Amino acid sequence: MYYMLIGFIIVVIAVIGAGYILKRKHYQRINELEEKKIKLRERPVIDELSKVKKLKLTGQTEALFESWRSSWDEIETRLFPDLEEVLLEAEMNTDRYKFRSATHAENDIEQMLVVIEKQMDQILGGLKELLISEEKNAKESRATKEKFAELRREVLTRGFKLGETLPYIETKLSELSESLNSYDSLTDQGDHLEAREIVIVVQKEMQVIEAQMERIPSLLHETDTILPEEMTKLRAGYEEMVRKGYYLAQMELDKEISRMKNQIDKMKKNVINLDLDEAEQGVEELHNEIDLFYDTLEHEAEARHFVKENHSPTSDKLQRQNAVSDALAEQITEVKQTYHVAEDDLAVYLKTSAKLSEAKENFEQLTALIASGEIAYSAAQDTLKEIDAALITISAEQDKFAEELRSLRKDELEARDDAERMRRAIITLDRKMERERLPGLPEEYLSLREHMGESINALEKRLEEKPLNMKAVSQDWRIAEEDLTHLTEKAEEMMENVRLVEHVIQYANRYRLRNKELADELVQAENHFYNDYQYKKALEIAVTALEKVETGAFKKVEKAYESKVSVDDIE
């Protein structure tokens, strides 16, 4: 019982202690919120409202002021009283240990303070801006009016430079003057915000007018003086070149100058209407067009120099190429008596001849047009360049064809010499075979030998034809050379096989008496060697038989043969 009482007392003390701590914590937060409320109460909203109220307010400014005052009335009559009630509720809940309810109330107070502070910031900010606006308007209106007066003076002193745009500028200034009067009226009435907007608009408009007044004189100078003078100079240069014999009808200058005058009139209207960007673009484009016409005239002058420098040389080139073409025609006639000239080759000559005739005709027409002054020198220059390029191509093609004709005789002589050389090569090969003292020649080789003779006969027969077809000769010549190469390779292979067979059999004889199988196979190899002259087959049989008895023996025999070592010396 005693211990239970002690435990109960401890629990009571703990609860009371915890309640005290929580209560103290809530009072601390409530005090902080109360201090924040007091600070908000101390903000000088009423003072600022009083300052602005002393100003004479109308229109937009008055409406704004009334909205700010209404907002403050709401804070005074509703928001602050509501705040006081919730503060009292938080204190009561804390006293009664209703900490959860107290926490909710404290949170509501914080939100209410945020709303009040934000609303007061808006009121004070607006009032401050209004007061500053009134002061700033006064300063800027003085500066704006001074700038306006300066613009007025400049129009009076420099108005003659503005030409037909002067009435438009004066109208703009009159409109600005009315705006400034409206500003004064609104200021007197107390509508400072709307007056502020007018000042800003007037300042921007004056900047635009000032920039226009800077640009207009130079644009008018361009349209009234510079561009017309440029066109006059262009026409004078054009007419001077026509008097000197230039053909310039392709430029259609009268039509183009009329068009450019219309462009100038359009640019003047743009300037008068103060569409200055478009006017400046038009001026730049027209200068570029005039420059292009000058470039054309300059090109014609350069082309005239080119034509005078190159007309006679081109005429000389034509005459020389005509002479070359005529000589080539005679050469073709002579060659055709001896050689067959293919139609394709003749077509090449005929094509170049037609090109040459066309170039000659173009040159004659050009010469006539230059003499009559009916062609622009630039066009004449282009035609001369085309003719010169055509002559270069024609010359190269005809030189190539002439070289091919000259090579016919050279190729014929080489073919005849080579046919004789191939006959001598066969005789030499036959003698070499005889020195080898072969048992005989196989049918395959004899057939190749016979075919080789027929190939040379065909070549020699072709060389006796009239007219001589060198393409056919070249074909027979190539076949004969291929046959000779093949025959020579076969002969060398056959003689090589004969020597190797003899060496292999001679080496194998050391086993012949002791090995019947080897002896029988060697007899078979010798039959092929001496009877049907199949030397390659004889070698294969002898090598196979020897390798059965002594592996690697053939390599030793082959090495000894290549080194010219006697078979008897092979170990």
Curated annotation (Swiss-Prot):
Signal peptide start-end: none
Record-level GO cellular component terms: plasma membrane; septin ring
Disulfide bonds: none
A Pfam family hit: EzrA
Coiled coil: 22-43, 127-147, 194-214, 248-298, 326-374, 400-437, 478-529
Cytoplasmic-side segments: 23-571
Superkingdom assignment: Bacteria
Extracellular side: 1-3
TM region(s), chain numbering: 4-22
GO biological process: division septum assembly; septin ring assembly
Keywords, ordered alphabetically: Cell cycle, Cell division, Cell membrane, Coiled coil, Membrane, Septation, Transmembrane, Transmembrane helix
Compartments in which it is found: Cell membrane
Membrane topology, as annotated: Single-pass membrane protein
Entry similarity comment: Belongs to the EzrA family.
Protein function: Negative regulator of FtsZ ring formation; modulates the frequency and position of FtsZ ring formation. Inhibits FtsZ ring formation at polar sites. Interacts either with FtsZ or with one of its binding partners to promote depolymerization.
HAMAP family, alphabetized: EzrA
Annotated protein name in UniProt: Septation ring formation regulator EzrA
UniProt source species: Listeria monocytogenes serotype 4b (strain F2365)
High-level lineage: Bacteria, Bacillati, Bacillota, Bacilli, Bacillales
GN (gene name): ezrA
